[in-house]
């Protein structure tokens, strides 16, 4: 039997994710949830939903999250961590409010949250904290006893997140034809966001020049590129690029776009490209459509050999990293001296999001941070 690990004062872990449709009839209602309050016509949502309809109306994120749940529960059981794991989403079933209600009914009073976003940004962190505040407000209106909720820190530079991506890039390089392999360029891909949102990401002292969002991605890209060089003996050129832009064309977003980048690399004589989706925990629709479908078609049009490396997904090392993050935060809550595990130059991220971190355009209550209205 494994030694019993102590997660106290926490009595549950909540996997908090974006959500996605499970069939064609779910696509438009799901997109209505995503775009709530923006007044987008249903016909326009049907056009946007074509990405999902190409895959039978099913988002891959749901099965990815189910696999991650299984991996977490397996890892926790094998290592003596008695901590039940629940799952709730922002935009589709299982909805966050329903899951929190279930957790309260099960007697959970101290909850840790793992968001399926590794980096600092409004949509990847604070918006989830706003969702938590909304859910707590709903439970409060029902007269339920509210649990205390904390959120695990950003884990972009934890070895259990970085090392599986290194393996993925090395495998993708090996899949390229031998004659182009050593000259291959690595395009580290992440979700584009408005430059104003990037500049405001992270704590106030990190605002500007892309903010924490860009700096964290660059740190991970360097870590992976350095590790790939050590593994292969080849110093592959690389660049951080962006994908999945949306919104009004006059609003500046982070660039270059992956398809534009492929055109530029081909024109510069690059013989092959590996696309490494470091901004995504698992194979979201943005990975399957924007990279595997759209960007891959662009590469074929250009005659440019291209491979897409694997996301972390339910890799056992990532499940072990989550266990490590849980124990780290639990020890810190108990007042113990804890040494956080982090690679790169930026160090471990904060446990508690400070006031002014990743601000919204219109201020809203956000739980699990220094500015939380819930104790």
Swiss-Prot record:
This is Coproporphyrin III ferrochelatase. Its EC number is 4.99.1.9. Keywords: Cytoplasm, Heme biosynthesis, Iron, Lyase, Metal-binding, Porphyrin biosynthesis. Its main location: cytoplasm. Belongs to the ferrochelatase family. Fe(2+) binds at residues 191, 286. Involved in coproporphyrin-dependent heme b biosynthesis. Catalyzes the insertion of ferrous iron into coproporphyrin III to form Fe-coproporphyrin III. NCBIfam families: hemH, PRK00035.2-1. One of its GO terms (molecular function) is metal ion binding. GO terms for biological process: heme biosynthetic process. It holds the Pfam family Ferrochelatase. It is found in: Cytoplasm. CDD domains: Ferrochelatase_C, Ferrochelatase_N.
């Amino acid at each position: 039997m494994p030694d019993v690990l102590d997660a106290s004062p926490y009595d549950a872990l909540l996997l908090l994710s974006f959500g996605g449709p499970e069939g064609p009839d779910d696509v438009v209602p799901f997109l209505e949830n995503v775009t709530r309050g923006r007044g987008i016509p249903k016909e326009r949502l049907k056009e946007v939903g074509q990405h999902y309809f190409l895959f039978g109306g099913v988002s891959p994120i749901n099965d990815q999250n189910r696999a991650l749940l299984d991996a977490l529960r397996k890892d926790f059981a094998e290592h003596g961590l008695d901590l039940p794991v629940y799952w709730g989403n922002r935009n589709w079933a299982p909805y966050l409010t329903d899951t929190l209600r279930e957790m309260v009914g099960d007697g959970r009073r101290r909850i840790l949250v793992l968001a399926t976003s590794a980096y600092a940004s409004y949509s990847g962190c604070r918006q989830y904290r706003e969702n938590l505040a909304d859910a707590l407000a709903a439970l409060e209106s029902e007269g339920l006893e509210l649990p205390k909720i904390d959120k695990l820190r950003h884990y972009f530079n934890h070895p259990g997140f970085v090392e599986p991506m290194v393996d993925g890039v090395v495998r993708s390089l090996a899949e390229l034809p031998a004659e182009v392999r050593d000259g291959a360029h690595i395009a580290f891909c992440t979700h584009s966001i408005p430059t104003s949102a990037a500049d405001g990401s992270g704590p106030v002292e990190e605002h500007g020049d892309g903010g924490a969002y860009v700096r964290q991605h660059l740190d991970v890209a360097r870590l992976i590129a350095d590790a790939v060089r050590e593994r292969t003996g080849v110093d592959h050129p690389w660049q951080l690029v962006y994908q999945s832009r949306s919104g009004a064309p006059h609003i500046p977003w982070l660039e270059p776009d992956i398809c534009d980048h492929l055109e530029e690399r081909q024109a510069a004589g690059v013989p092959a490209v590996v696309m490494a989706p470091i901004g995504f925990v698992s194979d979201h629709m943005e990975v399957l459509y924007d990279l595997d479908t759209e960007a891959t078609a662009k590469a074929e049009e250009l005659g440019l050999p291209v491979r897409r490396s694997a996301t972390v997904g339910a890799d056992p090392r990532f499940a072990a990293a989550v266990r490590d993050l849980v124990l780290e935060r639990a020890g810190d809550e108990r007042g113990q001296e804890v040494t956080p595990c982090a690679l790169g130059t930026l160090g471990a991220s904060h446990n508690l999001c400070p006031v002014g971190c990743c601000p919204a355009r219109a201020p809203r209550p956000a739980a699990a941070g220094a500015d939380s209205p819930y104790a």
